């Protein structure tokens, strides 16, 4: 984690295709129980999201889903509640990145399945859906305070940006939302869900 953090801090402008691997390392570190590991990985991930996305988002777009998944894992680490809340805040800032560059997602067909996805739906498939789905996963997996924050941010994103969603995107979104509430109907297996 320290080596990857050092590489990001010193050579971020030279990293082109390695962002997926960087987020994979930080995703693994996000679930660790050692505070120093989680903190270093999260600080570097936060720097990528807040500083580097502003400067070089187009060259990092292929790793966007990995970044969101990584933030979701930080949010679900129950041992570090402050990091969890900050990770959810960063997911919300990722929504701003998606909203600011919808054409970038449409134009950049770098993934193998993008040929089957209509150009106008690529921002949904590669941007909005992974972001909203990751928040729903946090709602389903985490402690009450983190779940509540994730649900609040999920609905804030929908209220803020939902007017730009196409009708077929809403169908996908409702499936995600209904899944959250369907999970709450299941018999209790985890004490955290009993808090609802």
What are these regions (language model features)?
Residues 2-6, 24, 43-50, 69, ...:
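Residue-level signature of alpha-solenoid helical repeat scaffolds
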Residues 1, 75-119, 174:
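Eukaryotic alpha-helical scaffold "rod" segments
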Residues 95-102, 149-165:
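A short, hydrophobic/aromatic-rich structural module that often spans a beta strand
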Residues 45-49, 100, 104, 140, ...:
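Extended alpha-helical scaffold regions
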Residues 1, 9-17, 25-40, 55-59, ...:
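Short coil/turn segments at helix-helix junctions and helix-capping linkers
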Residues 20, 65, 129-130:
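Amphipathic alpha-helical repeat elements characteristic of tetratricopeptide repeat
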Residues 23-25, 42-47, 64-68, 109-112, ...:
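Short alpha-helical linear motifs
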């Amino acid at each position: 984690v320290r080596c990857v953090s050092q590489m990001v801090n010193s050579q971020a402008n030279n990293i082109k295709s390695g962002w997926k691997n960087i987020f994979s390392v930080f995703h693994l570190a996000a679930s660790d129980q050692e505070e120093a590991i989680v903190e270093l990985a999260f600080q570097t991930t936060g720097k990528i999201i807040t500083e580097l996305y502003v400067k070089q988002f187009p060259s990092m777009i292929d790793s966007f889903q990995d970044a969101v998944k990584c933030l979701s894992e930080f949010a679900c680490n129950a041992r570090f509640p402050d990091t969890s809340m900050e990770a959810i805040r960063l997911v919300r800032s990722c929504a701003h990145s998606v909203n600011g560059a919808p054409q970038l997602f449409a134009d950049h067909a770098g993934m193998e399945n993008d040929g089957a996805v209509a150009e106008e739906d690529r921002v949904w498939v590669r941007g909005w859906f992974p972001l909203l789905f990751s928040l729903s996963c946090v709602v389903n997996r985490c402690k009450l305070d983190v779940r509540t924050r994730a649900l609040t941010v999920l609905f804030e994103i929908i209220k803020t940006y939902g007017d730009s969603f196409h009708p077929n995107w809403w169908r996908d979104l409702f499936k995600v939302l209904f899944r959250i509430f369907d999970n709450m109907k299941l018999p209790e297996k985890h004490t955290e869900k009993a808090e609802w």
